[in-house]
């Protein structure tokens, strides 16, 4: 155990360039790649992240995917939902796909989605 502590202490004194050189030397010596080690380490993290969405989502983002044929109606509805001015609402609609409202409850997101779809827009909830 004392040897490991000494190694850790010695490694802690290396500069970034020396550490990079050490990594290259170890890759050559052991016939491995640091990139492969990173990919292996990232695997379990992705699995843990996939388990997280099993919980109920509480905040939603309403995204305007497309404005469809009724652009003016969609602009009016975006103004009503967001409180934006005419130019800002028009710019948002024309830049679709674009978030209209972020961090809203599920009920509010569904209400906004229904209103925008009624105006002719294609809407996604994220």
UniProtKB/Swiss-Prot annotation:
Gene3D superfamilies given in the database record: 3.30.1390.10, Single helix bin
What's a GO biological-process term for it? translation
| UniProt GO molecular function | mRNA binding; structural constituent of ribosome
Q: Does the keyword Ribosomal protein apply?
A: yes
Q: Can the keyword Oxidoreductase be found in this entry's annotation?
A: no
| Keywords for the protein's UniProt record, in alphabetical order | Ribonucleoprotein, Ribosomal protein
Pfam families, sorted:
Ribosomal_L12 (PF00542), Ribosomal_L12_N (PF16320)
Which cysteines are disulphide-bonded? none
Recorded GO cellular component terms are: cytosolic large ribosomal subunit
Q: Which PANTHER family match?
A: 39S RIBOSOMAL PROTEIN L12, LARGE RIBOSOMAL SUBUNIT PROTEIN BL12M
* Family note: Belongs to the bacterial ribosomal protein bL12 family.
Oligomeric state and interaction partners are given as: Homodimer. Part of the ribosomal stalk of the 50S ribosomal subunit. Forms a multimeric L10(L12)X complex, where L10 forms an elongated spine to which 2 to 4 L12 dimers bind in a sequential fashion. Binds GTP-bound translation factors.
Q: What does this protein do?
A: Forms part of the ribosomal stalk which helps the ribosome interact with GTP-bound translation factors. Is thus essential for accurate translation.
Q: What is this protein called?
A: Large ribosomal subunit protein bL12
- List the lineage, top down: Bacteria, Pseudomonadati, Pseudomonadota, Alphaproteobacteria, Hyphomicrobiales
């Amino acid at each position: 155990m004392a040897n490991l502590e000494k190694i850790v202490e010695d490694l802690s004194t290396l500069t970034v360039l020396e550490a990079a050189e050490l990594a290259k030397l170890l890759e050559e010596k052991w016939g491995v790649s640091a990139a492969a080690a990173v990919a292996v380490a990232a695997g379990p993290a992705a699995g843990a992240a996939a388990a997280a969405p099993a919980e109920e989502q509480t905040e939603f983002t309403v995204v305007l995917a497309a404005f469809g044929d009724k652009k003016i109606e969609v602009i009016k509805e975006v103004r009503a939902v967001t409180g934006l001015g005419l130019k800002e609402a028009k710019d948002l609609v024309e830049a679709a796909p674009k978030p209209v409202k972020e961090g809203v409850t599920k009920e509010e997101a569904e209400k906004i989605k229904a209103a925008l779809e009624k105006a002719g827009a294609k809407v996604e909830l994220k």
